[in-house]
């Protein structure tokens, strides 16, 4: 769920998801128009694409369990949906950490109408 995703983002990046990522660029927090603005925004596109592979799941509301061992996120076994949601969220949090150097404050609260052009395919 968005609760666990938020915790993972804090643990991996040290940034609060709100406002850092909730309205970042063209893909973080919804909108999904135009090409990603940078590698951070591309992490959000990849996360959206991952969720698209889970049509029978409820990734924003299904709660799941995970733990951290030696600094790594471990998705705990539960239902197939919850495990797959956790893996999508983990991939996003790790991607955001790996791309912290591309994070640009000017893309926070980026107006969605500025996102123009063809949407990048998954």
Curated annotation (Swiss-Prot):
<keyword id="KW-0964">Secreted</keyword>
<protein>
    <recommendedName>
        <fullName>Phospholipase A2 homolog ECS_00014</fullName>
    </recommendedName>
</protein>
<feature type="disulfide bond">
    <location>
        <begin position="50"/>
        <end position="88"/>
    </location>
</feature>
<feature type="region of interest" description="Important for membrane-damaging activities in eukaryotes and bacteria; heparin-binding">
    <location>
        <begin position="105"/>
        <end position="117"/>
    </location>
</feature>
<comment type="function">
    <text>Snake venom phospholipase A2 homolog that lacks enzymatic activity. Shows high myotoxin activities and displays edema-inducing activities. Has cytotoxic activities against HUVEC cells (LC(50)=12.2 uL) and human lung adenocarcinoma A549 cells (LC(50)=8.5 uL).</text>
</comment>
<dbReference type="GO" id="GO:0050482">
    <property type="term" value="P:arachidonate secretion"/>
</dbReference>
<dbReference type="InterPro" id="IPR036444">
    <property type="entry name" value="PLipase_A2_dom_sf"/>
</dbReference>
<dbReference type="InterPro" id="IPR033113">
    <property type="entry name" value="PLipase_A2_His_AS"/>
</dbReference>
<dbReference type="Pfam" id="PF00068">
    <property type="entry name" value="Phospholip_A2_1"/>
</dbReference>
<dbReference type="InterPro" id="IPR001211">
    <property type="entry name" value="PLipase_A2"/>
</dbReference>
<feature type="disulfide bond">
    <location>
        <begin position="49"/>
        <end position="122"/>
    </location>
</feature>
<dbReference type="InterPro" id="IPR033112">
    <property type="entry name" value="PLipase_A2_Asp_AS"/>
</dbReference>
<feature type="disulfide bond">
    <location>
        <begin position="75"/>
        <end position="86"/>
    </location>
</feature>
<keyword id="KW-0959">Myotoxin</keyword>
<dbReference type="InterPro" id="IPR016090">
    <property type="entry name" value="PLipase_A2_dom"/>
</dbReference>
<dbReference type="GO" id="GO:0006644">
    <property type="term" value="P:phospholipid metabolic process"/>
</dbReference>
<keyword id="KW-1015">Disulfide bond</keyword>
<feature type="disulfide bond">
    <location>
        <begin position="43"/>
        <end position="95"/>
    </location>
</feature>
<dbReference type="GO" id="GO:0090729">
    <property type="term" value="F:toxin activity"/>
</dbReference>
<dbReference type="GO" id="GO:0047498">
    <property type="term" value="F:calcium-dependent phospholipase A2 activity"/>
</dbReference>
<keyword id="KW-0800">Toxin</keyword>
<dbReference type="GO" id="GO:0005543">
    <property type="term" value="F:phospholipid binding"/>
</dbReference>
<feature type="disulfide bond">
    <location>
        <begin position="28"/>
        <end position="44"/>
    </location>
</feature>
<feature type="disulfide bond">
    <location>
        <begin position="26"/>
        <end position="115"/>
    </location>
</feature>
<dbReference type="GO" id="GO:0005509">
    <property type="term" value="F:calcium ion binding"/>
</dbReference>
<comment type="similarity">
    <text>Belongs to the phospholipase A2 family. Group II subfamily. S49 sub-subfamily.</text>
</comment>
<feature type="disulfide bond">
    <location>
        <begin position="57"/>
        <end position="81"/>
    </location>
</feature>
<comment type="subunit">
    <text>Monomer.</text>
</comment>
<dbReference type="GO" id="GO:0005576">
    <property type="term" value="C:extracellular region"/>
</dbReference>
<dbReference type="GO" id="GO:0042130">
    <property type="term" value="P:negative regulation of T cell proliferation"/>
</dbReference>
<dbReference type="GO" id="GO:0016042">
    <property type="term" value="P:lipid catabolic process"/>
</dbReference>
């Amino acid at each position: 769920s968005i609760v666990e995703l938020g915790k993972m983002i804090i643990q991996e990046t040290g940034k609060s998801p709100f406002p850092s990522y909730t309205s970042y660029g063209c893909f973080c927090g919804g909108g999904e128009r135009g090409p990603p603005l940078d590698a951070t925004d591309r992490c959000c596109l990849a996360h959206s694409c991952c969720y698209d592979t889970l049509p029978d799941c409820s990734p924003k509301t299904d709660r799941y369990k995970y733990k951290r061992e030696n600094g790594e996120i471990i998705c705990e076994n539960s239902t197939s949906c919850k495990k797959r949601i956790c893996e999508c969220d983990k991939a996003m949090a790790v991607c955001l950490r790996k791309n912290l150097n591309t994070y640009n404050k000017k893309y926070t609260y980026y107006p969605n109408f500025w996102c123009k052009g063809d949407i990048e395919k998954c």
